[in-house]
UniProtKB/Swiss-Prot annotation:
Organism, scientific name: Dugbe virus (isolate ArD44313) (DUGV)
Keyword Ribonucleoprotein: yes
Cofactor info, note text: Stimulated by divalent cations such as Mn2+, Co2+, and Mg2+.
Domain notes: The DEVD motif is a CASP3/caspase 3 cleavage site essential for viral replication in host cell. However, the importance for viral replication is apprently not linked to caspase cleavage. This motif is involved in homooligomerization.
Official protein name in the record: Nucleoprotein
Length: 483
């Protein structure tokens, strides 16, 4: 047995894929990239079962099975086959061998990242590595395997019957974001939009114009916004969010220049006021750095996971070789046939005689992870993130590709559903069905991760296929207008 998707480049792959796709009779009326899907999944039975369920184990099983059912036939077959082709497999696994120094900042700290949220530099380094992998391997062969650079969508159209649900999900995303940035106290959720004028002030400061601190557009340099956070700090955070975290270092340098100017021009300032201003701005910058770390933690959520890159990193770390890749593909394909909870997943991985089974278990995040799991580093594996691997390697069992006709459900592939209202936005419609099931069985406010909101957020970001990278998408997806 071996990988049957034999292709070293796009030309060879297209030659392999043409007869394969004809045999599978792929369709694209409901999905962005051609799939096996011929109808929008009907999950009404799962919703009824959830309403009658009495214990968490049963509820988990119902929801997990609904996820598999919802995504069983919607995967982008072309992109999944390309991701698993012999050339991409060989190049990707050898890429990590050759680029150990390039991934060192987070790979060498993997044990720490299994326990807590990452530093901003570790997130940036991950994305730089993902971009390098994509370029070196020649991964991006069409619009559904590329890195996105567009602004987030301003409007998101949904059918009237699900509009209330989508708006409810969006409101909860905003609430969770504000709790993360502002804490869980009485000011949580009060964070308002940051004005363009304030952002311009922050950009000028980052550009070296320290004189702007003498007369900020909001008046008193210590003035706070609704959240209780100084406006100077929130302006700095926004600049870092829009233009990159290096801007905070630029602001630090501007404040050092300010300090020197104050020392050299004491006669031009009221007694003690110059040093007081420097100290105040230094405090505001320190607060901005901490807020930026939290904001970066938010940006680390799954919308920023480069799914194929992480999948190959986990495979490489677990000891998968090109010769054994087909066994991992088969395991993940079977995983998408019927839902498995975390315990069953670990049992199955423990039971396999293949070394990569134990290797994957050793990569799993700690049970006592410090912080919200939604914000863990995108290179850290969890039982839930096994579905990320499945979305890439488990749709087509590479040793017997024709078996793909049986379908294999992995949640991230829901993004391949179209968002066109001409076909009733099957992406949002399917996510809402899952949300209703989840809402019926669980107290969503108490959950660290609401997986359905997470999927909808990625649709807002503009991901139309799990094989795309969305890190460079500009703007805040939660500012979208639902119509």
């Amino acid at each position: 047995m071996e990988n049957q998707i034999k292709a070293n480049n796009k030309k060879e792959f297209d030659e392999w894929f043409k007869p394969f796709s004809e045999k599978l009779q792929l369709r694209s009326n409901l999905t962005n990239s051609a799939s096996l899907c011929d109808r929008v999944p009907d999950l009404a039975l799962a919703e009824m079962k959830m309403a009658l369920a009495t214990d968490d184990k049963e509820k988990d099983s119902i929801f997990s099975n609904a996820l598999v059912e919802a995504t069983r036939f919607c995967a982008p077959i072309y992109e999944c086959a390309w991701t698993c082709s012999t050339g991409v497999v060989q190049k990707s696994l050898s890429w990590f061998d050759k680029n150990k120094d390039f991934i060192k900042l987070w790979d060498a700290k993997y044990m720490d990242l299994k326990k807590g949220i990452p530093e901003p530099e570790q997130l940036v380094s991950y994305q730089q590595a993902a971009q390098k992998w994509r370029k070196d391997v020649g991964y991006e062969i069409n619009q559904f395997t590329r890195s996105l650079t567009h602004p987030v969508v301003a409007e998101y159209k949904v059918p009237g019957e699900i509009a209330v649900d989508v708006k409810e999900m969006l409101s909860d995303m905003i609430r969770r974001r504000n709790v993360l940035l502002n804490g869980d106290g009485e000011n949580a959720g009060k964070k308002g939009p940051i004005s363009r004028e304030h952002v311009s002030w922050g950009r000028e400061l980052a550009g070296g114009k320290f004189q702007v601190v003498f007369n900020p557009p909001w008046g008193d340099i210590n003035k706070c916004g609704k959240s209780g956070i100084p406006l100077a700090a929130t302006a700095m955070v926004k600049v870092a969010e829009l233009d990159g975290s290096k801007k905070l270092e630029d602001i630090r340098q501007a404040l050092l220049d300010l300090k020197k100017w104050v020392e050299d021009n004491k006669d031009a300032l009221e007694d003690g006021k110059g040093n007081e201003l420097v100290q105040t701005m230094t405090k505001h910058l320190a607060q901005a750095v901490e807020l930026s770390k939290k904001s970066n933690a938010l940006r680390a959520q799954g919308a920023q996971i480069d799914t194929p890159f992480s999948a190959y990193y986990w495979a490489w770390s677990a000891g998968v070789k090109p010769e054994t890749f087909f066994t991992l593909s088969q395991f993940l394909f079977e995983m998408g046939q019927s839902a498995r909870g975390g315990k069953k997943m670990i049992k199955a991985l423990t039971s396999t005689p293949l070394r990569w089974g134990k290797g994957l278990i050793n990569l799993f995040a700690d049970d006592d992870f410090l912080g919200n799991r939604l914000y863990m580093h995108p290179a850290v594996l969890t039982p839930g993130r096994m579905s990320e691997m499945g979305a890439c390697f488990g749709v087509i069992p590479v040793a017997s590709p024709e078996d793909a006709i049986l379908g294999s459900g992995h949640s991230k592939n829901i993004l391949n559903f179209k968002i066109d209202t001409s076909v009733q936005n099957p992406c949002a419609s399917t996510i809402v069905q899952l949300y209703r099931i989840q809402k019926s069985g669980f107290d969503l406010e108490s959950l660290e991760v609401v997986s359905t909101e997470h999927l909808l957020h990625q649709s807002f970001v503009g991901k139309r296929c799990p094989t795309q990278n969305a890190y460079k998408v500009r703007g805040n997806a939660t500012n979208v207008n639902i119509i």
